Amino acid sequence: MKTLTILGSTGSIGTSTLAVVRANPGAFRVVALVAGKNVDVMLQQCREFSPRYVCMANEGAAAALRQRLFECGLGTIAVMSGEHAACELAALDEVDQVMAAIVGAAGLLPTLAAIRANKRVLLANKEALVTCGRLFMEALSHSQAQLLPIDSEHNAIFQSLPTAVQQQLGFACLREHGVTRIVLTGSGGPLRQLPLADFDAVTPTQACAHPNWSMGRKISVDSATMMNKGLEYIEARWLFNASAEEMEVIIHPQSVIHSMVRYRDGSVIAQLGNPDMCTPIAHAMAYPDRVPSGVAPLDFCRMGSLSFEAPDMARYPCLQLAIEAFAEGQAATTALNAANEIAVAAFLDGRLRFTDIARLNRRVVEQLRCAEPDCVEAVLVIDSAARQLAQTLSARFSR
């Protein structure tokens, strides 16, 4: 039985992880749960999964949870709070693997703690590689930790790679193992066929109407701009030690093929499945074995045809910007990620037009010139500066 700490247990990935645990009670045991301020959901999780330890973001939430656990007869569960406690729970001796699903910068140090403690790290936190790719891969090289990707695209690529590359993830030479290209697929989002002339008038409702996946508003907008694919491109470069020439991004509107790997003999290996995050989560949790995920099997006879097209960078300037930012370095990708969060929030609030998202992102990356970060603290300084600049510049865009 594998033992587990879940960082971000009350979020989407965290609850899906617990769904896989629920479906496989003899395979996994939850030792620790870490979350933000959602006491109600954490209480429900404690009742069902009986962790030994729980950590909330602040002492106020922790105190409220302690009281409610005591009232339920679960007062033996140790309730902690704060980032330091989250790092401790990520590095527990009794834990085999850590689901790193805390969103944003708050997840960086706990994920790094898990790597330094030689855990199997199931990586769902985008910021870990988008903002700290070099730092995380250096930490991985000095530890015996194993990284397994949770993003559906990166997990699909992982499954399609040779075992030797899987076992040296981030360090193996793709060419030496017969791999010529990694093919990152994306649906193209809900605006794929909208005339470019109509982009200025796109509303948040339009941008959030994803055709295949059920997602939050921020990531739905990122899908519409294909910034999500740009961030996944950055992650893939680090995860698979891939050069720009070894990367390919294509649009696949049906979201059935989650990504592919090309080999020198002309073979292409792909991973297919219904669009449900429980599939990659179950794969990573059980690797190298397989367990039921609870996801309905793919019905090929009802699936219909699959189509592909090249991304139009005039339609998706955020994708092009992410590719360029990776070539510039970690400071640029950190600035881009931070600026995009500000830009998307402003769009959702009605303060920016849809087309201003890419314009604002580019201005921040071009204007904010910083030295390459050599620690997480330096990354956070760049992140903060980029957010401040994006806020200032966004005021100059008028609807």
From Swiss-Prot:
Species this chain originates from: Edwardsiella ictaluri (strain 93-146)
Cofactor(s), names only, from the UniProt record: Mg(2+); Mn(2+)
Pfam families, per database record: DXP_redisom_C, DXP_reductoisom, DXPR_C
GO BP: isopentenyl diphosphate biosynthetic process, methylerythritol 4-phosphate pathway involved in terpenoid biosynthetic process
Family: Belongs to the DXR family.
UniProt binding sites for 1-deoxy-D-xylulose 5-phosphate: 126, 152-153, 187, 210, 223, 228-229, 232
Name the record gives this protein: 1-deoxy-D-xylulose 5-phosphate reductoisomerase
Known pathway: Isoprenoid biosynthesis; isopentenyl diphosphate biosynthesis via DXP pathway; isopentenyl diphosphate from 1-deoxy-D-xylulose 5-phosphate: step 1/6
Enzyme class at the top of the EC tree: oxidoreductase
